[in-house]
């Protein structure tokens, strides 16, 4: 009897992401998340040296071992819609990072340490900012060429020449997060200050069945370097 394979409509995979994509596609729930034609996948540990911490040693070395976080990948939806709002806004408002957690991130027994969970929550919030900056800069090509250039979008906050950092974060742990397992950490833009100088993000840790383990709310500030005055 011939077995018909279901056609897999995968996401757009950015350079360097295929190896991690192949790994996570072994997880059925991840495959389901990839069915959207707007999904874009990029490596969390990449080689783009744009000074935004994406290749910092915490994730590229310290947590990049077989028993800590051997695999991780970023996913977001490229669903560009032209806006004419004069209120501050960003190209994408949500993203997810999938992590394979090993036993080396545990603080007691097989329970992931709360400090590691907080680090992951903060990390994904930062990834959301980096994705927006790279879409604006064209480092990540958009489905519609030039769609996310700030000069073409009134009210869009330009992150291409800005630095952004956590100002404050509040974390609530809901239940023990056991390892090893694959988790999804999702960040959602909640609000932007009317001045465009800060934004609020909510982030959630879930297992691949959708159960929540930790929730964080954080304020992020945007630092735009002032032009040097001429003597």
Swiss-Prot record:
Pathway: Secondary metabolite biosynthesis. Keywords: Virulence. It comes from the Eukaryota. InterPro entries: HotDog_dom_sf, PTE-AB_protein. The keyword Ribosomal protein does not apply. Disruption phenotype: Leads to highly reduced verlamelin production. The keyword 4Fe-4S does not apply. Part of the gene cluster that mediates the biosynthesis of verlamelin, a lipopeptide that exhibits antifungal activity against plant pathogenic fungi. Verlamelin is a cyclic hexadepsipeptide and is bridged by ester bonding between a 5-hydroxytetradecanoic acid moiety and a carboxyl group on the terminal Val of amide-bonded tetradecanoyl-hexapeptide D-allo-Thr-D-Ala-L-Pro-L-Gln-D-Tyr-L-Val. VlmA and vlmB are altogether regarded as essential components in the biosynthesis of 5-hydroxytetradecanoic acid. This is Verlamelin biosynthesis protein B. It comes from Lecanicillium sp.
